[in-house]
């Protein structure tokens, strides 16, 4: 049983362009930096809705004083409830999922909104592009470009001067935050699946649910950029076996889904086609063996 969640809406004078959902777990310095960057560097007016997990470091008091909508739990309830609960307070037609350890670059919102305006439907999943300070295995991130590994040593002026100078293509997959969905689609898939609490593999599961309701426009927008400090709050929590849960739920591994469906990290080429039947069959056979082995280990 999770800790009881309380809901605290704050009225706005006008309808926001985006409702930005940010779960935070005793990470006040990063949350301040994140929200201040949204306020400074956004072209449009947005609603920020925070889920405060515990908030014993002063987060709860700070959020109350910022005239923000927020939800609160006295214990950490993970990212699934941490996104689903603030989503109930969203006032915009567009929901943005964000971590609390981002610095949003200027006009991040404009570039996402322009992508949305180019479409004539709501069946999309569009996200910004992360800049990280250390080398990464992910081709969908701009790295390494070190502007500071913590908020305390963040070189904001250098970042603002250089962030837009790194050449990078739009990319397939859109599995990273900040991620924007139409509220109707978010409601249609039921948000994040809480059986993945505290949250490992909840994002790929959400992407699979989007695929199943017909979303085929998965785009990472290069010009919409955030700096990611990689403040790993997951190191403080007992993790669920998300990879195994995903395999048992969907009958395929995350890697198969990323490679065959989302084409994660490849140069963006438009709407994502269905997987190649022959290649997909081979990967599914491998995953079926993995799944049977996982079930056998569970029941042994």
Walk through the language-model features, giving the residues of each:
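A short, conserved alpha-helix in the catalytic core of glycosyltransferases
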Residues: 111, 168, 172-190, 196-224
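N-proximal low-complexity "stem/linker" segments adjacent to membrane-targeting elements
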Residues: 1-37
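Short, flexible, basic/aromatic active-site loop/helix in glycosyltransferases
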Residues: 146-172
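Active-site donor/metal-binding and catalytic loop motifs
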Residues: 131-133, 194-197, 219-237, 245
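Short aromatic/hydrophobic "clamp" motif used to bind/position activated sugar donors
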Residues: 95
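A conserved acidic beta->alpha catalytic loop
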Residues: 37, 44, 52-60
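Conserved donor NDP-sugar-binding/catalytic core segment of glycosyltransferases
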Residues: 107-147
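Glycine-rich, basic loop-to-helix element that forms the pyrophosphate-binding segment
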Residues: 73-90
């Amino acid at each position: 049983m999770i800790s009881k969640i309380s809901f605290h809406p704050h009225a706005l004078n006008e309808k926001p362009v985006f409702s930005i959902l940010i779960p935070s777990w005793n990470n006040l310095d990063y949350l301040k930096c994140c929200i201040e960057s949204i306020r400074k560097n956004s072209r449009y007016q947005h609603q920020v809705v925070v889920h405060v997990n515990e908030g014993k470091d002063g987060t709860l008091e700070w959020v109350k004083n910022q005239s923000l909508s927020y939800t609160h739990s006295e214990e950490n309830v993970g990212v699934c409830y941490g996104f689903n609960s603030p989503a109930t307070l969203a006032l915009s037609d567009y929901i943005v999922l964000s971590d609390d350890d981002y610095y949003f670059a200027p006009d991040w919102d404009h570039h996402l909104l322009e992508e949305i305006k180019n479409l004539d439907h709501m069946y999309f999943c569009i996200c910004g592009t992360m800049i990280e300070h250390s080398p990464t295995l992910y081709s969908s991130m701009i790295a390494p470009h070190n502007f500071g590994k913590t908020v305390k040593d963040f070189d904001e002026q250098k970042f603002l001067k250089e962030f837009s100078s790194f050449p990078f293509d739009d990319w397939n997959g859109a599995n990273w935050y900040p991620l924007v969905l139409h509220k109707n689609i978010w409601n249609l898939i039921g948000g994040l699946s809480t059986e993945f609490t505290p949250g490992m593999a909840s994002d790929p599961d959400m992407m699979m649910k989007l695929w199943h309701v017909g979303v085929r426009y998965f785009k990472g927008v290069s010009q919409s950029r955030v700096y990611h400090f990689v403040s790993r709050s997951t190191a403080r929590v007992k993790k669920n076996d998300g990879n195994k849960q995903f395999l048992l739920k969907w009958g395929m591994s995350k890697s198969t889904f990323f490679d065959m469906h989302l084409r994660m990290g490849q140069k963006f080429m438009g709407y994502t086609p269905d997987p190649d039947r022959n290649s997909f069959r081979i990967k599914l056979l491998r995953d079926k063996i993995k799944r049977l082995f996982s079930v056998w280990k569970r029941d042994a």
